[in-house]
Amino acid sequence: MNTSLKLSKQLSFGEEIANSVTHAVGAVIMLILLPISSTYSYETHGFLSSIGVSIFVISLFLMFLSSTIYHSMAYGSTHKYVLRIIDHSMIYVAIAGSYTPVVLTLMNNWFGYLIIAIQWGTTIFGILYKNFAKKVNEKFSLALYLIMGWLVLAIIPAIISQTTPIFWSLMVTGGLCYTVGAGFYAKKKPYFHMIWHLFILAASSLQYIAIVYFM
């Protein structure tokens, strides 16, 4: 298992409280929304859409939950080291999860399944990289997140032709939130990680509304 992630900068107690609370809120909200979203999607778009939306909400829940637990652990502990790897891995899962309902609902064809395969394939690669690379390059990991997110450009024609401007406007705005937030994450200044978390919450909320209610 990778050990290079142990060397991350120690954050203050206040920063870690802020980091934990921001994503704990997201985890609780997603857990509450899971049955509501799944039922609504089944009634409006059918079985495949319900499966896709469920995967999407579960992936967000796992991302928020792992982040919350990670930031609650004592710095330097084995538990925090393990949870850091899981926390970063769940970001891949959340990004791939956001593509799944869109493809299953709007692009139930070979190209759509290719996009899903690329997304989940990259997710598996990213998780293995986080776990087994001798030295994890954080900029490379961040680049993978952004590449996965902006692969949406490949499916924009299908999205625009089958949805309203509200849907794709919300999705693109969510993508921009992730991108802007990543800039705060990369700078490693005090409380910038919390700001990154807030951008993730905003992006997740926008894309949740788009996928569940406007797709």
What name fits each language-model region?
Residues 1-215:
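Multi-pass alpha-helical transmembrane bundles in non-GPCR membrane proteins
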